[in-house]
Every structure is written in C-alpha cells, then in structure tokens.
Amino acid sequence: MSTLEVTATGAAADAVTTHVPTLVQDRVASRIFAKDHTLWGPAAEDESAKRLNWTGLPRTSRHLIGEVAALREELSQAGYDRVVLCGMGGSSLAPEVICATAGVPIDVLDSSDPDVVRAALTDLDRTVVVVSSKSGSTVETDSQRRAFEQAFRDAGLDPTARMVIVTDPGSPLDNDARAAGFRVVNADPQVGGRYSALTAFGLVPSALAGADVETLLDDAEAVSDLLAADDDANPALRLAAAMAGTQPLRDKLVLVDDGTENVGFGAWAEQLIAESTGKDGTGILPVVAIGAAPASLYDDGTVVRLVATDSESDSDGEQDTSDAGGSASSAASLVTVAGPLGAQIMLWETATAVAGRLLGISPFDQPDVESAKAAARELLDAGIGAGVEPAFTDGSVEVTALGGDWLGDATTVDAAVDTLLGLLDDQQGYIAVMAYLDRLGDADLELVARDLFDRTGRPATFGWGPRFLHSTGQYHKGGPATGVYLQVTT
C-alpha cells in the first residue's frame, strides 16, 4: 500500500463511481484547501468562514514543536513526569489516540464523577496538568481545573508551576489564567474542536507526554497535496463518497480495528463524524465495533476496516473482505483504510467535510450541542437538580422512562430493557448505551454494545458520560430520530 490508501467494494464502490467524478468536476477538494466557505450552502457560510484553518495545520502548527519540547524539558528537570489532561471532546480524544499510538502514558480526565476525579488527584509532586478548553467555559473541565488547583495548594505546591492552559485567545479561561500567572498556549480560533487534533489542543499534551508530534505533522503534511487534488484517486473524495453517497444512504458507519497501528482511532473518528454530520434530521452514525463487525451490519451499514499500513489490497483498488468479520453478501458496503496517524487525521477531516456537502449540511456547527448546553445552564441557574421520579425500583436499581409512557407493565430491569429494545425500528433503528461510570474501572461494560448487537441485530453504540455529550450527543439530538437510549448512572 501507499502511505495513505482507501479501497472500496460493493455499495461503497458504487458510491465512489457515482459521486467522485462530480466532486472532481466541482473542484471540491481544492476549494476546501483554498478555504472556500461557500461549499456548504448560504446558510453555512458564516460558520464555515471561521472554521477552515485546519487545512493548513500541518505547516502552521510547526512552531509548537520547539516551544513544547522546551517546556517539556523544563518540567522534566523539575521532576514532573506524569501528565494529566483535563478536557472534553476534541480537547481530549485526539491526545488520547496520539499518545496511545505513540505508546506514551497520559492520564485523560474527561469525567465529572467525583470518585474518578478524586482518583486522579494522586502523585501531585510529579504531576503536570494540562487544562484544555476551546471555549474556556466548559463546565466539566472548569470543575477539574478547580479540583487540581485546590489539591496542589492543599499539598503546599504552586499550581501555576504545574499547570498548562490550552484555550482560544480571549476566552474566559485565557483571561483568567493569564491574570493568575499560569502558562497559557493559545490555539487557532478558526479551527473547530473536533478538527483540532493538529492544533495546540492535540499537540501540547501529547508532546508533554513524550509523543513525537513532529512526525505526526510530517505525515499529515505529506498527504495534504494528495487530499487537495481534484482527482479521481483522491482518497478523501473516495472515502466521503463511501460514507455519505450510498443509495439508499447506509447511515451506519461501522469502524473495525483490523490491525491498525493507530490505537483507539475509532473513538476520535466517532466524534468527528457524529458531531459533524448528525443534524437537520440526517447524518452518519459511527459505530465503533468491539471485535469483528456482526454479519447483520453488512446489510444496511458501511463497514470500514482500519488496517495496518503494510496490509495488501488488490491492484484494482478492491479489497479482500474475507477476514472483516461476519459474512458479507454481494450487496455489502465495505471500505479499507490504511495510513499513519497524521495522514489519517487529515484524511478523515477532509472526507467528513466533503460528506457534509453530499448530505447537504454544514459539517462545522453543532447546533444541538450548543442548545443543550444552554438548557443545562438554565436548569443549574434555576437550582433544579432533583431530576425525574423513577417509574419503579428493582432492588437497588431505579428505572426512569423518558419520552412517553412506553414502559407498560414492566416492573423489573430486565423487562424494562426488553420493552425498550422492542421500540427499535428493525430497518433503521440503533441503540445508544450511555454510562456515567468509571470508564477505566468499569471498562468491561463496553462489551454490552456487542451483546446488544447479537441480541437485536441492530447497531449499538457505547459512550461514557459526560464525554459522549461532546461527541455522539449531537447525533443523538440532531440526527435521524431512530434511536433508543439506555442510560446508566450512579
């Protein structure tokens, strides 16, 4: 394989044949990299005009390499060898996959659970904390920042010497942190959060943890011209067509780790795709598969195999699907993607932007996330926190039903789950499991998604709260109204 390759078969290949020539004719790729904000229609122009700087990040972010290397050396000399990242959504997902792929440790704190936060407040004498928030007002991140500041002070340690702030210039966090004497690194404000992997949000915590961010940028820059080319072979155009151009639309995109060296890549791609496309009643639902993709998903979804860069594909661009899991039919929609992490970040960002054009939506806003944040602030300001009374209690488990009187006669957890699953549309439906628990201590709970695949034959996603609110939450609220939702809290 070349440095970056996308191959397709079945319905995905048909979509490539149908849509790529038009995308080439319309010069979509080159216009994206020229920052043409008119590509997504008049209603999207204002937002798009201030969200396209991600296209040049492989070059414009290079100044961070030396700056962060010097900071890491300074912190290392002071004895700080543990990096904790406080952030949500795009501020945490990219550093997590960058560090996991590089094999360097970083503790990502993207939970508001008091026990999880408390457990992170350890080894303070050797800890540097990176606080990342684009808006500078993310509630979860602000609470984590305050917890660490207080913990450092209680231990007799200076927080300003041990905390690094990453935020947009002029944000509330930027202003407050500078006034208090903290180190501040500003990110490019004309890059959206989910497109920020190659900005300070992705690079600063990753480099402080020891990841080689120069190679990451090198790999991204090496494919930029390829992705900007108005050419049938452009892998981003091919991937976008496979994602958003099947007829009828296969709106479930199943991401299967099939040997890729990019560890945890699916979680980063999940946010990018769901938050970019899930709006106006349409969108692509990314499903991060646990193991091989269930056979039923070949019937109505597109399965993407994330493979190692040394994998082999047929010379005509079609892929070997014999080990993709399940049993592919002749009508299957299958894609194989390979390439180093930096290259794939640019690939998927470009493809998602193109997919937005094919779907007729803006890939750069998140209207339902913003409205949900506003509603939450109103509730907090009003002092409302008691929630809804449970429908019944089964042992120590309280069961609450939202969205109508659908529980019927159910009086047990098992019966309630059965009733919920009975609401699934057997053609278009999906299940979203959301758990406000410890994603490290309760990691095995993710396997429930695979169990629900097997039980219902329908796609099932799993998200840890509250981080899913900054990821798939936009799709849940703004995408097709075909989901049923199972939320687990303590």
Regions found by a protein language model. Give the residues of each.
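Low-complexity, highly charged intrinsically disordered N-terminal segments
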Residues: 2-83
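Glycine-rich oxoanion-binding loops at beta->alpha junctions
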Residues: 53-70, 95-146, 288-294
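Conserved beta-strand elements of the Class I
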Residues: 82-86, 128, 164, 254, ...
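Glycine-rich, small/polar surface segments that engage phosphate groups of diverse ligands
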Residues: 82-106, 462, 468-470, 484-486
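Short beta->alpha connector loops at strand-helix junctions that form conserved
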Residues: 109-110, 132-133, 185-191, 335
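Active-site phosphate/pyrophosphate-binding segments
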Residues: 154-304, 317-319, 323, 338, ...
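Extended C-terminal subregions enriched in glycine
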Residues: 432-467, 472, 477, 482
